[in-house]
Swiss-Prot record:
Keywords: Calcium, Disulfide bond, Glycoprotein, Glycosidase, Host cell membrane, Host membrane, Hydrolase, Membrane, Metal-binding, Signal-anchor, Transmembrane, Transmembrane helix, Virion. This is Neuraminidase. It comes from Influenza A virus (strain A/Chile/1/1983 H1N1). GO terms for biological process: carbohydrate metabolic process; viral budding from plasma membrane. Residues 91-470 are annotated as: Head of neuraminidase. It is found in: Virion membrane; Host apical cell membrane.
């Protein structure tokens, strides 16, 4: 075969291959078009994109959500329209508390990537509830978890994750650099308050939908601090309480009214014989009720209620069923501070129903162990220790910690009332469990229902020490 024939032969072969490839590509395009037509049915077909497929590969789980997008509409499973959370409803009538969530974060963290945290709390928008928490910039079972018993450090941050999930780097959202914090949703956006900085010059940074909108400088230079639970939004305005001053004597307490992250009004409480820290607040028929911690001299809890103009009233829960820790045995209460075992304290909450009160408290009088809910039908105004209902939540033998209130608005639940809920922190590690090098916690939450509930114990349940502790 001469050179010209070779060239012609090679060219013919290349052309034949090219034609075959073109035919295959055309066939592939036709196949995809037919498949798409069958899948969508018609151009106007819509469907909810909610199919979730889980595959497993080499012991690593992959969560794949397949979304079919056609030429016209994608229908979401939930209406994301902004609303204004009115906060005008009264609290729902309840008979007890139903378990709502448990994240088991310490148990999961023995083997998985879970943040070292404390001060978790829950807050809900009209679409979802989220767990907020203060990380220590470290993971469980890692060397940086050493020494995390410390409250205030530059590594702490407010983050959030979906309620009931263990807080990890893979499901958590950064909110603010903070060692004291609060957050709430007004129906249009999240307000976050994060306090960080030195003890004598800390600054609260306010963010609205993630953007810095305002700052508040420590006015007493004595550890500016806030609620460690949700703030309260009513008719587009959000309210929070901050404390600055001694933890064992009279301090300064201010209420702030905030709209879209900007402070519109603030007042200082005239309460020389009261002590307000780490307030747990909730809306009730358009007003705000806060039940707080007296770390100075009260074993019963102080309260402050105020309207949207910040006109306020103050007092102490009168019941002889005392709510703080440490505390004396139940007995004769007072509408002023009960000073027996009144020093120190723990964050907690109560819900007022007329003259009655649901009191959440540790089961132990002297340590942060166990948790129970008690209904005292006259406890807001009367000083006896009689109660009608006691519901066990955490056994006396298991660790608890901080607790606080949160509510679910009618815009979320579809009810015509405000559903009361609460969370309990389950602290593990130091200072009580000295076999560890770290301090962290998991959390449980409950919501009020007007139906049957269970008495049981929902403890943290992690077996300590971890590998890093040995």
């Amino acid at each position: 075969m001469n050179p010209n024939q070779k060239i012609i032969t090679i060219g013919s072969i290349c052309m034949t291959i090219g034609i075959i490839s073109l035919i295959l590509q055309i066939g592939n395009i036709i196949s995809i078009w037919v498949s798409h037509s069958i899948q969508t049915g018609s151009q106007n077909h819509t469907g909810i994109c909610n199919q979730r497929i889980i595959t497993y590969e080499n012991s690593t789980w992959v969560n794949q959500t397949y979304v079919n997008i056609n030429n016209t509409n994608v229908v979401a499973g939930k209406d994301t329209t902004s609303v204004t959370l009115a906060g005008n409803s009264s609290l729902c009538p309840i008979r007890g508390w139903a378990i709502y969530s448990k994240d088991n974060s310490i148990r999961i963290g023995s083997k998985g990537d879970v943040f070292v945290i404390r001060e978790p709390f829950i807050s809900c928008s009209h679409l979802e509830c989220r767990t907020f928490f203060l990380t220590q910039g470290a993971l469980l079972n890692d060397k940086h978890s050493n020494g995390t018993v410390k409250d205030r450090s530059p590594y702490r941050a407010l983050m959030s994750c979906p309620i009931g999930e263990a807080p990890s780097p893979y499901n958590s959202r950064f909110e603010s650099v903070a060692w004291s914090a609060s957050a709430c949703h007004d129906g249009m956006g999240w307000l976050t308050i994060g306090i960080s900085g030195p003890d004598d010059g800390a600054v609260a940074v306010l963010k609205y939908n993630g953007i810095i909108t305002e700052t508040i400088k420590s006015w007493r230079k004595r550890i500016l601090r806030t609620q460690e639970s949700e703030c309260v939004c009513v008719n587009g305005s959000c309210f929070t309480i901050m404390t600055d001053g001694p933890s064992n004597g009279p301090a300064s307490y201010r209420i702030f009214k905030i709209e879209k992250g900007k402070i519109t009004k603030s007042i200082e409480l005239d309460a020389p014989n009261s002590h307000y820290e780490e307030c747990s607040c909730y809306p009730d028929t358009g007003t705000v009720m806060c039940v707080c911690r007296d770390n100075w001299h009260g074993s019963n809890r102080p309260w402050v209620s105020f309207n949207q103009n910040l006109d306020y009233q103050i007092g102490y829960i009168c019941s002889g069923v005392f709510g703080d820790n440490p505390r004396p045995k139940d007995g004769k209460g007072s509408c002023d501070p009960v000073t027996v075992d009144g020093a120190d304290g723990v964050k907690g909450f109560s819900y007022r129903y007329g003259n009655g009160v649901w009191i959440g408290r540790t089961k132990s009088n002297s340590s942060r162990k166990g948790f129970e809910m008690i209904w005292d039908p006259n406890g807001w105004t009367d000083t006896d220790s009689n109660f009608l209902v006691k519901q066990d939540v955490v056994a006396m033998t298991d660790w608890s910690g901080y607790s606080g209130s949160f509510v679910q608005h009618p815009e979320l639940t579809g009810l015509d009332c405000m559903r009361p809920c609460f969370w309990v922190e389950l602290i593990r590690g130091r200072p009580r469990e000295k076999t560890t090098i770290w301090t962290s916690g998991s959390s449980i939450s409950f919501c009020g229902v007007n139906s049957d509930t269970a008495n049981w114990s929902w403890p943290d349940g992690a077996e300590l020490p971890f590998t890093i502790d040995k």
